[in-house]
């Protein structure tokens, strides 16, 4: 189980100041992150260490991360919001 302190910290780190990222990351950390396994949680935390411009490109599907684990996390976040 994820502690409230960790979720609060991740919530604030997920607020990037770029609306396009905020609308993807904030709901993900609130609704999905608590149910992830530890490997995926670690990957999400690693994603938050990336530059906003890099993440913007990945989420807009203009580029891909060289790290396959980060790309998998980006896909997981996008799959959550894109119509099937």
Curated annotation (Swiss-Prot):
- Entry's Gene Ontology BP terms: succinate metabolic process
Output the InterPro entries linked to this UniProt entry.
SDH, SDH_sf, SdhE_FAD_assembly_factor
Membrane-spanning ranges? none
Q: Which organism is it from?
A: Pseudomonas fluorescens (strain ATCC BAA-477 / NRRL B-23932 / Pf-5)
One Pfam family cited in the UniProt record for this chain: Sdh5
> What name does the UniProt record give this protein?
FAD assembly factor SdhE
Q: Which GO terms describe its cellular component?
A: cytoplasm
User: Superkingdom, according to UniProt?
Assistant: Bacteria
Question: Gene encoding this polypeptide?
Answer: sdhE
- Record key words, sorted: Chaperone, Cytoplasm
The upper taxonomy is: Bacteria, Pseudomonadati, Pseudomonadota, Gammaproteobacteria, Pseudomonadales
